[in-house]
Design a protein with these regions (language model features):
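Pocket-lining segment of extracytoplasmic ligand-binding domains
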Residues: 127, 134, 206-207, 212-302
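Short, glycine-/small- and polar/acidic-enriched structural segments
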Residues: 67-210, 224-230, 246, 253
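Secondary-structure end/capping motifs
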Residues: 267-353
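C-terminal motif of bacterial Sec signal peptides marking the signal peptidase cleavage site
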Residues: 18-21
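N-terminal low-complexity, Pro/Thr/Ser-rich intrinsically disordered segments
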Residues: 44-77
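Conserved C-terminal helix/tail region of periplasmic/extracytoplasmic solute-binding proteins
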Residues: 341-377
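Bacterial lipoprotein signal-peptidase II cleavage site
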Residues: 23-32
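Bacterial N-terminal signal peptides that target proteins for export
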Residues: 1-9
Length: 377
């Protein structure tokens, strides 16, 4: 009986030991599972954070890429131009997509009547207009706030004094009837020619007539001579026996041509001004690289054949950016805009076109051309 109890006790002890061992194993397993789960959770959290970081980096990269590829802010401007070989390239600027290339939305308006473009600028219908230095100074003398921002060209023969076959010298102009648009460049050219031989406007019978009408009137025999610019001198030379007496080629630098901005847009949106200046110089590059296409575009706007348009080539000298920048500087001859302006001011008053001289300070701003040269020179 005692032996049976001892055996039973031994069995109970063994069972207890076995249970304890199993409990210990379960706890170890639980701890191991817990540790493994914790490690898994930590790994998952690390992976999630890494994924989120990668996604953030990718988003930043996409944003940077988008910033780099996104077009610059588009500026909307209105530009007026008229019939002159130095301004016809603006039609190329438009048709070649150069305005869009630089970030401009441009309403480009062609004026068959040059004076109408000047008037449109004066009443605030335009942000920019193409004008001669004479007419810009006249506008400023009248109180308009304008700034010259581009030197397009110099007239080197496309402004002409044309006379009938009986007149062969400037001295012979005394007493003759001569038509030109009053107060503008060909009137100015005429006066310079007269003064070169000691004559004045009082020595002739001057008729102030719009350029297109003056050319047609001369061709019909209404005047002895006429002062006209391209393309209108083609009409004047239709008169039998007529010939050029002198031209802007005889007075280098006397007639510079420009893109003129309102003072308001220069002050309030210089970025738009810079874009337009950039567009102009990109256009000059385009003319060199695509001469045939460009010539066809310009001849179409000029309402003439390509052959006739080629006749204007030597009479207008387009300025490179470097040449334009030099013209903005000081000088002691007509290669300097400042010097030429000093010649024009008394003419405007003496001809009765303005009551007072135009203020020169602030009229010329070569900084936009200088910026182009610094970036592309």
């Amino acid at each position: 009986m005692a032996t049976a109890r001892l055996r039973l006790l031994a069995i109970l002890v063994a069972l207890l030991l076995l249970a304890a061992a199993c409990g210990s194993d379960d706890e170890s397993a639980d701890e191991t599972e817990t540790d493994d789960a914790a490690a898994t959770d930590e790994g998952t959290e690390d992976d999630t954070e890494a994924d989120e970081a990668d996604e953030a980096d990718a988003a930043d990269d996409e944003a940077e890429s988008a910033d780099e590829s996104a077009p610059a802010e588009v500026d909307s401007i209105t530009v007026g131009y008229s019939a002159w070989p130095g301004w016809f390239p603006l039609a190329v600027t438009e048709q070649a997509g150069i305005f869009e290339e630089v970030g401009l939305d441009v309403e480009l308006i062609f004026f068959a009547d040059y004076l109408a473009s000047i008037d449109a600028m004066a009443v605030g219908e335009l942000d920019f207009v193409t004008q001669t230095l004479n007419d810009t100074m006249a506008s400023v003398a009248f109180g308009d706030e304008q700034v010259i921002v581009v030197v397009n060209d110099n007239s080197t023969g496309n402004d002409k004094i044309i006379c009938d076959g009986s007149i062969s010298s400037i001295e012979e102009l005394a007493g003759k009837t001569i038509a030109a648009e009053a107060g503008v460049v060909d009137h100015f050219l005429l006066v310079q020619g007269l003064e070169s031989v000691g004559l004045t406007e009082d020595d002739i019978d001057f008729r102030g007539v719009l350029t297109d009408a003056a050319a047609a009137g001369f061709a019909a025999g209404e005047f002895d001579c006429v002062g006209v610019f391209a393309p209108f001198w083609l009409t004047a030379l239709e008169r039998e026996g007529s010939a050029e007496l002198f031209s802007s080629a005889d007075f280098p630098g006397l007639i510079p041509d420009h893109i003129v901005a309102t003072r308001e847009i220069v002050d309030d949106n210089p970025d738009a001004v810079q874009k337009l200046v950039d567009a102009w110089y990109l256009t000059l590059q385009y003319l060199e690289e695509n001469p045939d296409e460009s010539l066809e575009i310009m001849a179409e706007v000029a309402d003439t054949s390509v052959e006739d348009y080629n006749l204007f080539a030597d009479g207008t000298t387009l300025f490179s950016a470097e040449e334009a920048l030099a013209a903005f500087g000081d000088g002691d001859d007509t290669s300097s805009l400042l010097f030429t302006a000093e010649l024009i001011n008394p003419f405007l008053v003496d001809s009765g076109f303005t009551e007072s001289e135009a203020p020169i300070e602030g009229l010329f701003d070569g900084s936009f051309t200088e910026d182009w040269v610094n970036r592309n020179g």
